[in-house]
């Protein structure tokens, strides 16, 4: 909780990820103050290392993708950009930014284990018994049979990771500033 309050230096929208003992920071609109997302995350990592903490960082267009990268990608700072840079010139039509971003997210999340989707352990075990080990294994499968066999939560978590279903976190309320004053009859020196 204290770390999430400390992180308000980067954005007023910070929250606690209770089950995973982590924090959420919505940096949209604030990253330019630090030279971009990479600069913001580097500053945060440096300050936390100076305090003796070593954390894993990820920035992504969705909460689900950021969580997956922070918990299951190799250690380091991971950034999935909101939009890939448009090529200066192209011989063929270029896919819109959302399509390119989604393809990049699929590529990066595919090798991560199923637990990166934040699914129940029973569902994860059932998927593994069926021979499905990583996110990429279920991305190409038909959705209806997956839902029938493993439940709708699996598809909801997959959709949250790719931004097809909105997901948000509850930001911490700003600490109340306490101001007390007292008027005296005579000036106090």
Predicted regions and their residues:
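Gly/Gly-Pro- and Ser/Thr-rich, intrinsically disordered tail segments characteristic of DNA damage-repair
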Residues: 1-189
């Amino acid at each position: 909780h204290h770390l999430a309050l400390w992180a308000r230096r980067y954005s007023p929208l910070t929250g606690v990820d209770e089950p995973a003992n982590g924090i959420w920071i919505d940096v949209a609109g604030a990253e330019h103050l630090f030279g971009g997302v990479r600069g913001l995350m580097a500053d945060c990592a440096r300050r936390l290392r100076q305090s003796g903490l070593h954390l894993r960082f990820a920035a992504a267009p969705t909460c689900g993708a950021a969580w997956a990268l922070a918990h299951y990608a190799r250690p380091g700072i991971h950034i999935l950009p909101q939009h890939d840079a448009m090529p200066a010139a192209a011989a063929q039509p270029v896919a819109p930014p959302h399509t390119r971003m989604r393809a990049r997210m699929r590529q990066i999340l595919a090798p991560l284990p199923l637990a990166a989707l934040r699914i129940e352990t029973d569902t994860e075990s059932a998927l593994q018994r069926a021979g499905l080990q990583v996110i990429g294994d279920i991305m190409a499968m038909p959705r209806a049979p997956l839902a029938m066999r493993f439940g709708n939560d699996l598809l909801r978590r997959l959709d949250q990771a790719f931004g097809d279903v909105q997901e948000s976190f509850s930001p911490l309320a700003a600490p109340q500033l306490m101001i007390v004053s007292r008027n005296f009859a005579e000036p106090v020196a």
